[in-house]
Amino acid sequence: MSAEVKSIKAREILDSRGNPTVEADVVLSDGSFGRAAVPSGASTGSHEAVELRDGDKSRYNGLGVHKAVANVNTSIASAISGFKASDQQGLDNLLIELDGTPNKAKLGANAMLATSLAVAHAAAASRHMPLYRYLNNSEEYILPVPMFNILNGGKHASNSTDFQEFMVMPVGAKSFAQALQMGTEVYHSLKKVLKGMNQNTTVGDEGGFAPSLPTNKDAVEVILKAIEKAGYRPGEDIFIALDPASSELYQDGKYTLATENKTLSSAEMVDYWCGWVEKYPIISIEDGLFEDDWDGWKLLTRKIGNKVQLVGDDFYVTNIKRLDRGIKEKASNSILIKLNQIGTLSETIAAIKMANNAGWTAVVSHRSGETEDTTIADLAVAMNAGQIKTGAPCRSERTAKYNRLLRIEEELGGKAKYPGKDAFLNLK
């Protein structure tokens, strides 16, 4: 006998940037309980599902989510009452139907996702299973290689480089626990290196440092120095990953790199990345080009797609229609997975499966405005995604995910595999 949804209650809570977001509690007919809170992004893709905000300037500068909360507590609550909690696909289809818009503008992706995830958590509790096992009851699981965002620029930090995120990936680790240790040691090493340069060591939205560096290359150089000072070998133990968030640099058909006084065409931007990949131990570039620069993406993939993971975030917005086009046109070789870009768990899982079936990687990701919710850690393990991007090893809303992964690895024991370089399916 499968438990049914008895009640759902949503509320407005705060995210890690001090902005309101939606949290939902679900209780099933057998008393099982599930809770989920949704994150929110700073640099958002224009094709993302709609995050419903109140727009009432007298509360939270217009960012309140009373409308989304009310949607959960009224129309969604009555629609899902008595619904079989284990039928996730059916539940998500019902939410999509109830919303009835192509981009979830009526109910809000934040209202829908809070519901979708809270029901999944409750259904897992009903079966006395951790969420990752409920989503995929397997004999063996792959723990993700973490992407640690240790140096911030762009929209995540107000006084730094053109590019948004400079990350390290401990590809040479033997376990997730060791990867976390390596990433954390490099993070502390970077702090010392920056202090030695009389640089600011305050942290950005995702826990990375936000120094004032003269050029974008200086950011990479300072990280390479930090890796070595921590006792690791760049390009063997630890690789660099980038998220320049290039849509933020694009205007009128050109890419503007303000710190370098450069304005580049699409083909020149591709050559710029090719030069960086030649020079530095870079294993992954996310959103290296504007979200609608399809020709540029195809050119970049033709040139370096066999040696670097090219991840689409704003480019695909976890949307299978855009992803399907990307696969057909060979426009990248990886997708970033953000639950709140699409708004339901089932659609998120469908995007991961579509990427994997094409031989692409799927990187499960947080947002810059996070909560203490750890669903993405379980999702990464359940889907054997092999990679997770959830900030620096600093700030509790980031470390909550890493700590959840430590517990999962411990719980799985010999059934947990850390993939290292095997996580990058398409690299020669």
UniProtKB/Swiss-Prot annotation:
For whether the record's keyword set contains Transcription, the answer is: no
Where is this protein localized, as stated in its record? Cytoplasm; Secreted; Cell surface
Primary subcellular site in the record, as a coarse category: cytoplasm
GO MF: magnesium ion binding; phosphopyruvate hydratase activity
The residues that hold Mg(2+) are: 243, 286, 313
State how the cofactor is bound: Binds a second Mg(2+) ion via substrate during catalysis.
Q: Does the keyword Lyase apply?
A: yes
Q: What is this protein called?
A: Enolase
Which organism is this entry from? Answer: Dehalococcoides mccartyi (strain CBDB1)
